[in-house]
């Protein structure tokens, strides 16, 4: 069974968000998602300064099995991207909730957080797959 940290919020499309001290949110994909995809070989990230929209694709994770679109859980501006993934995409596999993060976004509407799932709700999504 996948690890689902209780302090994070989740999208049903398997992205997670973590609030940072500056009010921005770090985004990555869940341990469950990386297990389904398998070994990462390439990650395409948005650009710093890009505007992303909740529910729209903004990144791509390519594994030995498939390429998968990554959706932004929140609308806002990309403040940072995890440049370490360019040379080490396997960080998504080894540390999905830590060093394998994708990007940080400053949300334009924090009310969108209400559309995200808590750990229990996300577990229910996985169980229904």
Curated annotation (Swiss-Prot):
Positions where N6-lipoyllysine occurs in the chain: 65
Q: Per the record, a Pfam family?
A: GCV_H
Q: Which GO terms describe its cellular component?
A: cytosol; glycine cleavage complex
Which GO biological process annotations does it have? glycine decarboxylation via glycine cleavage system
Q: Which family does it belong to?
A: Belongs to the GcvH family.
Record's NCBIfam families?
Answer: gcvH (TIGR00527), PRK01202.1 (NF002270)
Q: What is this protein called?
A: Glycine cleavage system H protein
Biological source species:
Shewanella piezotolerans (strain WP3 / JCM 13877)
